[in-house]
UniProtKB/Swiss-Prot annotation:
Membrane topology (Extracellular): 23-335
GO molecular function annotation: ATP binding; calcium ion binding; polysaccharide binding; protein serine kinase activity; protein serine/threonine kinase activity
Family annotation (Gene3D superfamilies): Laminin, Phosphorylase Kinase, domain 1, Transferase(Phosphotransferase) domain 1
Tissue: Strictly expressed in siliques.
Gene: WAK4
Sequence ranges assigned to domain EGF-like in this UniProt record: 232-278, 279-325
Spans through the membrane: 336-356
Domain of life per record: Eukaryota
Stored SMART domains: EGF, EGF_CA, S_TKc
Source species of the chain: Arabidopsis thaliana
Glycosylation sites: 34, 56, 109, 115, 132, 182, 208, 293, 318
One GO cellular component, as annotated: membrane
Protein name: Wall-associated receptor kinase 4
Cytoplasmic-side positions: 357-738
Amino acid sequence: MKVQRLFLVAIFCLSYMQLVKGQTLPRCPEKCGNVTLEYPFGFSPGCWRAEDPSFNLSCVNENLFYKGLEVVEISHSSQLRVLYPASYICYNSKGKFAKGTYYWSNLGNLTLSGNNTITALGCNSYAFVSSNGTRRNSVGCISACDALSHEANGECNGEGCCQNPVPAGNNWLIVRSYRFDNDTSVQPISEGQCIYAFLVENGKFKYNASDKYSYLQNRNVGFPVVLDWSIRGETCGQVGEKKCGVNGICSNSASGIGYTCKCKGGFQGNPYLQNGCQDINECTTANPIHKHNCSGDSTCENKLGHFRCNCRSRYELNTTTNTCKPKGNPEYVEWTTIVLGTTIGFLVILLAISCIEHKMKNTKDTELRQQFFEQNGGGMLMQRLSGAGPSNVDVKIFTEEGMKEATDGYDENRILGQGGQGTVYKGILPDNSIVAIKKARLGDNSQVEQFINEVLVLSQINHRNVVKLLGCCLETEVPLLVYEFISSGTLFDHLHGSMFDSSLTWEHRLRMAVEIAGTLAYLHSSASIPIIHRDIKTANILLDENLTAKVADFGASRLIPMDKEDLATMVQGTLGYLDPEYYNTGLLNEKSDVYSFGVVLMELLSGQKALCFERPQTSKHIVSYFASATKENRLHEIIDGQVMNENNQREIQKAARIAVECTRLTGEERPGMKEVAAELEALRVTKTKHKWSDEYPEQEDTEHLVGVQKLSAQGETSSSIGYDSIRNVAILDIEAGR
């Protein structure tokens, strides 16, 4: 007996769970493929509403069908979604009928929903849908055009594509397409010269003139179409509420005689089942549509078909807002109002003070940034950039905050190097790109002019062997320049310093010399305004990961007007690389860079520093060192043993002679950088005969020594030299290394 009772309880529980799902009758399939069925629909015997065969579906190969139309969705909200194929007509090249088909359907007790449109594709065509097969009771649209326009993509406006709403209520329909009679000039929708007509749910078709729609000729391809369904033959007045399940509501159908059911508010499920509408627990559901709206001063209590908010002690429910409020104690209410009003007033005052302070701080910061901008030469930069001719560089203005973040607050661990014109930091921008940030020395106003000059010069340069300027920041106490990051240090580091590389072959060094010479030739001759670098040295030549040379540090550079060959300036440069003629006269020209390049070329050949006080007195300067070695025919003694071999001796000798020619005492005797670049390039790619002289007069050698000896002698006892030349003070940075 107990076993029988347990069995009955189990059956009751299973039946109740099945009804809670609100989908189908017990023991009936709930799905066909991916489509979920709901009563009154079904496809197994006894699973659909027996009084109406329209609810009898068929499931074939996991696909659900209704009267030959594939069903993709069923809803107990009285709608069925099916796939309806397109009708079409195709014409041959003479405009004659080639093939085509159209479709008609008897929907039984189901009717076409008003949420569909009739659509036509193709020029000079029209489509219609009829409820009885005759055109006089049809709804359609016309598509007229001479040729398809891609400008109409995305919308059916009557040009190549048209659409028209379809009224609800039809249960027997035919869909057809036609072409205007005697029109053979039609530009078709695709290569097949076909026109199409089809029903489609609103918003489910997007027109594109470039698409090929020939796939619509496949009977198994269709567009979603919405059908309305109801229980036919009786109205709610005739059947009463008993025909809908418990907690269900009956509504008359809008299309013909019939009715539909829906669950009352607070219930959900299938209203066509006796116990299909189940209570919604608003207190626990995660569905935001049904979830309760009780305030934090109350707790939610679920009721059948609704819920109730229970207020805490000393609170009562406001039925208008469904929120809890303090109970009507005048003293309590007054005290609460006073505290609340005082708190709000205090917060408003604090907020106002905070806003005023924030605004004042922003104003002060803006004024300070503007002050720094002017102090750092921002106005001068804008004026010079506007008057310097066309710019090849898009100079980006960085913010002070951005520079702090990029350098981690100018952390010492980010310092890449320090020189006469400031400190260089490694920076990381928000996009994770690595840059080099050059910061002028604090309190050195002379650096401002050099920074502005560097921006001005680099704005005129667009060359692969020049370090690229990305932008600047002038709203800080000292100006900042932002460059591309070159990862492998300087040429000085590789030849003499911490990054000394014994594998720096002759091919590497010759290529670097060609790149540096080509860059200087570009600056002198090909830039929009001729540029003299004025501080060429191995410490200002950067190398990337491929050992490609990049000329850097244009702080001392000068733009030379087109109508001038020389420019009188304060003498500036690095001892060991400084042109003796420029040092003595104060007149700067492109031959000054030629001299400095000759010194760099000698360093590449010998691996020796430009100035070395460990060498003999007469050879402290590398120019004297080379001159004496050339004169005494012992050049092989000073060439770096890492580069010379029996296969490249002639090339190295030619390169050495080029270096000596570049360092002649007077500029007139030196070649131009174009000639130097051409000769070095010839050494690199061919074995052509060298055009430089093979012998050097003894008098010229003496001139080399005399000019260099003066610089060396003056530089042995002082870190800086004061020289009164044409009433200008010359300041020379003595940097044997950097």
